[in-house]
C-alpha cells in the first residue's frame, strides 16, 4: 500500500474512535502547555546560581566543537522517527505522552540540581534556531541531557529492528559528542537514558491499565 494511502487509512481509523480522538487532542494541548511552561522555566534556571561539579572525565581533555555533527544526528533522527510514527497514530500518541512526561522529569531534576555549566564548554548552538530565529543560547539546562534522553526515547518507541539499532547508535554518538564538547557533565548524560526509560514505562503502565479496565 502506498505511504500516503496507508497514512490516510490509519489516521481515519484512529480518529473515528472517540476515545482515541479525545486522548490525542488532550495530549496535544497538555504537551503544548508543558513545553511553554518549560521554556519559561529554562529562563529561571539560566538566571540562578548553581554549583560547578568536579568531573574527572571532562578534566581529561579540552573541549571539541561537534555542534554540526550532533545536530545532524538529532534532526536526522527526529525526521526519521516522525516519518515512522506518523504511520501509527497510537504509537505517535505514546511518543508525545512519553516526551511530555520526560520534560516534566527534566524540570524537576533541574530544579533540584542547580548547576553551573562546565567552565570551558563550547556552547551547543542549534543551527536551525540560529538561522531562523534569535533564540538565547542556554548553558545551564544540564541535569539531565535532553538530547541524549530524547534519542534514547526514540530508540524505545521505534519498532523496526534496523531503525532501533540506528537510533541506539545515534544515542551513543550524541552522548559522547556532548561530553566531548563539554556541553554536559558526564553524569547528565549517564542518567538520561534512565529517565527516558522510566517515562516510557510509566506511560505504558497506565495505557495497559486503562485497556484492562475497558
Language-model features: locations:
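Active-site His/Glu-centered metal-binding helix of metallohydrolases
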Residues: 73, 149, 186, 190
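Membrane-proximal cytoplasmic C-terminal regulatory module of class A 7TM GPCRs
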Residues: 202-214
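Interfacial helix-loop-helix junctions of multi-pass membrane proteins
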Residues: 141-143, 173-199
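Alpha-helical transmembrane segments of multipass membrane proteins
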Residues: 30-38, 42, 105-110, 195-200
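Membrane-interface loops
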Residues: 45-54, 86-164, 171, 211-214
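Membrane-interfacial alpha-helical segments at the cytosolic side of multi-pass membrane proteins
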Residues: 78-83, 148-167, 193-203
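N-terminal transmembrane-helix/juxtamembrane module of multi-pass inner/ER membrane proteins
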Residues: 2-77, 115, 122
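Aromatic-anchored segments of alpha-helical transmembrane domains
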Residues: 35-37, 103-109, 171-182
Amino acid at each position: 500500500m502506498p505511504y500516503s494511502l496507508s497514512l490516510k487509512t490509519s489516521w481515519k481509523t484512529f480518529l473515528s474512535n472517540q476515545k482515541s480522538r479525545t486522548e490525542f487532542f488532550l495530549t496535544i494541548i497538555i504537551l503544548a502547555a508543558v513545553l511553554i511552561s518549560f521554556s519559561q522555566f529554562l529562563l529561571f534556571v539560566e538566571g540562578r546560581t548553581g554549583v560547578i561539579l568536579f568531573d574527572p572525565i571532562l578534566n581529561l581533555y579540552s573541549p571539541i566543537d561537534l555542534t554540526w555533527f550532533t545536530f545532524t544526528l538529532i534532526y536526522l533522527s527526529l525526521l526519521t522517527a516522525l516519518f515512522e510514527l506518523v504511520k501509527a497514530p497510537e504509537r505517535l500518541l505514546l511518543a508525545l505522552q512519553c516526551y511530555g512526561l520526560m520534560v516534566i522529569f527534566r524540570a524537576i531534576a533541574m530544579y533540584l540540581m542547580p548547576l553551573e555549566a562546565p567552565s570551558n564548554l563550547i556552547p551547543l548552538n542549534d543551527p536551525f534556531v540560529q538561522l531562523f530565529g534569535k533564540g538565547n543560547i542556554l548553558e545551564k539546562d544540564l541535569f539531565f541531557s535532553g538530547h541524549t534522553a530524547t534519542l534514547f526515547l526514540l530508540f524505545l518507541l521505534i519498532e523496526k529492528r534496523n531503525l532501533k539499532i540506528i537510533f541506539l547508535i545515534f544515542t551513543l554518538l550524541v552522548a559522547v559528542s556532548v561530553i566531548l564538547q563539554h556541553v554536559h557533565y558526564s553524569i547528565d548524560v549517564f542518567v538520561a537514558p534512565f529517565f527516558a526509560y522510566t517515562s516510557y514505562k510509566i506511560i505504558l503502565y497506565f495505557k495497559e491499565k486503562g485497556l484492562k479496565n475497558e
